Design a protein with these regions (language model features):
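Short, charge/polar-rich alpha-helical segments
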Residues: 1-11, 15
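Short, charge-rich amphipathic interface segments used for partner binding and complex assembly
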Residues: 16-23, 27-60
Length: 60
């Protein structure tokens, strides 16, 4: 179970990488940022969570 502080920190990282992927400096950087936020999604899914509209929610 994630604490509220952990959720806020992860959401912040996720949203930062997602935003950077939308306006990358180069194509390689876009791939880098996409990889980062997809990795966060994968780890959250393993822990029983998912991201919806930039917010972490528990899987049912």
């Amino acid at each position: 179970m994630l604490s509220e502080e952990q959720k806020r920190r992860i959401e912040s990282m996720y949203n930062e990488y997602y935003g950077l992927a939308l306006k990358p400096e180069t194509k390689d950087m876009k791939s880098f940022y996409i990889g980062k936020y997809l990795a966060i999604e994968d780890v959250l899914r393993i822990c029983g969570y998912f991201v919806h509209d930039g917010e972490i929610r528990e899987l049912d």
